C-alpha cells in the first residue's frame, strides 16, 4: 500500500514522501496516528494544498525540540535519589519514567518515551550518560546521577 507521509517517520521517510508500506502498518499505525494518508489522487491534491502548513508545523516541532535541547544543555545533569544497599545496588531500579519525572521537576518537560535506556533500567548508584531523543533529528545528552539512600 502506498501512503503519503504527513510528518517524518524514522526509518521510513520525511514529510511529503510517497512510500510503499505493508497494508497492516498503514491501516493500524500510520493512518490512525495521523502520520500518513493513503496515496489516492484526492489525498495527493489535498496534501499539496496543505503542504506549506504541514512544513510550518514540522518546523515548529523542531524548534521546540531545539529549545528543549538547549534547556537540557543548560541543566547539565540531574540527580535522582534512590534507596540502595551498602554495596551501591539499588532496591528496585531507576527507569525512563523516573528520569523523565526528575527532568520535569528540574524544569524541562520531557516524556518517558523520549528517554532511551539502551542497557535497561539503572540498577546501580553512579553517573550515567544518556541521550534524550526529543525529535527524530534532535538528540540531547544528559548526565544522570543516581545517589543512594541507605535504609
Swiss-Prot record:
Matching entries from InterPro entries are given as: Ribosomal_bL9, Ribosomal_bL9/RNase_H1_N, Ribosomal_bL9_bac/chp, Ribosomal_bL9_C, Ribosomal_bL9_C_sf, Ribosomal_bL9_N, Ribosomal_bL9_N_sf
* GO BP field: translation
GO MF terms listed in the record are:
rRNA binding; structural constituent of ribosome
Q: Name one GO cellular component term.
A: ribosome
Task: Please provide an example of a Pfam family that matches this protein in its UniProt record.
Answer: Ribosomal_L9_C
What keywords were assigned to this record? Answer: Ribonucleoprotein, Ribosomal protein, RNA-binding, rRNA-binding
PANTHER family, alphabetically? 50S RIBOSOMAL PROTEIN L9 (PTHR21368)
User: NCBIfam families under this entry?
Assistant: L9
Report the family membership: Belongs to the bacterial ribosomal protein bL9 family.
Q: What does this protein do?
A: Binds to the 23S rRNA.
Q: HAMAP family annotated for this entry?
A: Ribosomal_bL9
What's the protein called, per UniProt? Answer: Large ribosomal subunit protein bL9
Amino acid at each position: 500500500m502506498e501512503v503519503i507521509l504527513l510528518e517524518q517517520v524514522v526509518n521510513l521517510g520525511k514529510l511529503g514522501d510517497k512510500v510503499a508500506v505493508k497494508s497492516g502498518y498503514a491501516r493500524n499505525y500510520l493512518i490512525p496516528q495521523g502520520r500518513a494518508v493513503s496515496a489516492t489522487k484526492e489525498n495527493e491534491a489535498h496534501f499539496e494544498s496543505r503542504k506549506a502548513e504541514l512544513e510550518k508545523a514540522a518546523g515548529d516541532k523542531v524548534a521546540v525540540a531545539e529549545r528543549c535541547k538547549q534547556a537540557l544543555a543548560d541543566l547539565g545533569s540531574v540527580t535522582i535519589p534512590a534507596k540502595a544497599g551498602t554495596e551501591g545496588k539499588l532496591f528496585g531500579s531507576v527507569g525512563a519514567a523516573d528520569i523523565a519525572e526528575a527532568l520535569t521537576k528540574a524544569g524541562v518537560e520531557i516524556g518517558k518515551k523520549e528517554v532511551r535506556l539502551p542497557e535497561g533500567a539503572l540498577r546501580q548508584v553512579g553517573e550515567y550518560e544518556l541521550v534524550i531523543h526529543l525529535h527524530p533529528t534532535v538528540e540531547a545528552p544528559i548526565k544522570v546521577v543516581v545517589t543512594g539512600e541507605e535504609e
